């Protein structure tokens, strides 16, 4: 349920963009992101850090988009989020005992620290790649193409890397048995 709540804003944004425009879609994104934080609080008695960070960034960049009537702000939001994710993973890679990915998944998955570090580094590079790709698409293609790619392209890329990561982890778990 939490995962569905976390991807819902992107699809609400897409629907409102298709029926209205980027400014109405940005407003809907702010509202649904806020509602998701409230739902997390009501059902789970907490707002996880990713949902809160997502809401705050959506609120900030979405408000700037609406206030200045300039879609560049909402386009930069995802780039900045991807850069932050990349940096957090990279910093955890080199300056902490456990990489961030390991902290999220180690309760459910038991593999060696070296494999966690490889996975963490790959995801860090992935987020950096997505940040650069977002800038490229935002500036060299139409707004409609950018919205479609934001929703379907990045989602597909993310699911693909999740699949590859899962296969890699499964291979490492099998070797450890």
UniProtKB/Swiss-Prot annotation:
Q: Which domain of life is it from?
A: Bacteria
One GO CC term of this entry? plasma membrane
Membrane-topology descriptor: Multi-pass membrane protein
- Read off the InterPro entries from this record: YciB
Q: Where in the cell is it found?
A: Cell inner membrane
Q: Which UniProt keywords apply?
A: Cell inner membrane, Cell membrane, Membrane, Transmembrane, Transmembrane helix
A Pfam match: IspA
Which residues span the membrane?
Answer: 22-42, 50-70, 76-96, 121-141, 149-169
**Its biological function?**
Plays a role in cell envelope biogenesis, maintenance of cell envelope integrity and membrane homeostasis.
What HAMAP family does the record tag this protein with?
A: YciB
Q: Could you say which protein family the record assigns here?
A: Belongs to the YciB family.
The protein here is known as Inner membrane-spanning protein YciB
Gene from which this protein is expressed: yciB
């Amino acid at each position: 349920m939490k995962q569905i709540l976390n991807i819902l804003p992107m699809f609400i944004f897409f629907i409102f963009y298709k029926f209205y425009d980027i400014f109405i879609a940005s407003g809907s994104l702010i509202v649904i992101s806020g509602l998701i934080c409230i739902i997390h609080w009501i059902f789970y008695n907490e707002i996880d850090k990713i949902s809160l960070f997502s809401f705050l960034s959506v609120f900030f960049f979405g408000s700037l988009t609406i206030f200045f009537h300039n879609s560049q702000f909402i386009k930069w939001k995802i780039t900045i989020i991807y850069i932050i994710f990349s940096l957090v993973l990279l910093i955890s890679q080199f300056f902490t005992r456990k990489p961030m990915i390991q902290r999220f998944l180690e309760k459910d998955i038991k593999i060696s620290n070296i494999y966690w570090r490889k996975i963490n580094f790959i995801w860090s590079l992935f987020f950096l790649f997505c940040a650069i790709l977002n800038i490229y698409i935002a500036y060299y293609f139409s707004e409609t193409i950018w919205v479609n790619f934001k929703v379907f392209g990045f989602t597909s890329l993310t699911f693909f890397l999740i699949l590859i990561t899962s296969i890699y982890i499964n291979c490492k778990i099998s070797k450890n048995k």
